[in-house]
Amino acid sequence: MTILVINNKGQYNHRIQRSLQYLKIPTELVPNTLSIEEIEAKNPIGLILGGGPSIEGAGNSEEYIKHFDIPILGICLGHQLIAKAYGGQIDTSNTESYAKVEINIVNDENLFSGLAPKMEVWSSHKDEVKSIPDDFEILANSNLCDVESFKHTEKDVYGIQFHPEVHHTPKGSTIFENFYEICKKRCNND
């Protein structure tokens, strides 16, 4: 029942793992260089793709997105990698900084359960998703970014531009708890 946190070399990847551990969610932080077979051997119920400085340093993350049929949550760079893997567009933001942002939750099912209609988050906007792929829908937006969060319409694949693992996102732990519930539900249905 373990969720693997894929370390994309971002400064907060260890905090993602610690946040999950604090919530008593079984987790392991693994490098983004593991092969598909090495990930499969760990038998995860879900993947969280952490943030990182660049797509070029994302290792095998895009392969994981394309290969695995388990719940996936992409955070910041992970969010952008999901968009890229499915054919969305990523580009430089108009505001290249970290900022406290109020997001508007437009779909509060599953990942945002219990959090609507608005949520204060800590978000990085150096790069962002400019257009979502086919078969995706927007879950949240803000005055800085049209795509703060999205999900696949048929798969348990989610992306968020912001960082739920930092204290600047006061209700970030609820995102992780909701994702764990998605993973457990999926595991029980398979």
UniProtKB/Swiss-Prot annotation:
ATP-binding listed as a keyword: yes
CDD domains in the cross-refs: GATase1_GMP_Synthase (cd01742)
EC number in record: 6.3.5.2
Reactions the enzyme catalyzes: XMP + L-glutamine + ATP + H2O = GMP + L-glutamate + AMP + diphosphate + 2 H(+)
Glutamine amidotransferase type-1 domain: residues covered: 2-189
Active site: 76 (nucleophile), 163, 165
Record SUPFAM superfamilies: Class I glutamine amidotransferase-like
Classification via Pfam families: GATase (PF00117)
Pathway annotation from the record: Purine metabolism; GMP biosynthesis; GMP from XMP (L-Gln route): step 1/1
Keyword terms of this UniProt record: ATP-binding, Glutamine amidotransferase, GMP biosynthesis, Ligase, Nucleotide-binding, Purine biosynthesis
Top EC class of this enzyme: ligase
Gene Ontology molecular function, alphabetical: ATP binding; GMP synthase activity
One Gene Ontology CC term in the entry: cytosol
Functional note: Catalyzes the synthesis of GMP from XMP.
Quaternary structure, from the entry: Heterodimer composed of a glutamine amidotransferase subunit (A) and a GMP-binding subunit (B).
Protein name: GMP synthase [glutamine-hydrolyzing] subunit A
Organism: Methanobrevibacter smithii (strain ATCC 35061 / DSM 861 / OCM 144 / PS)
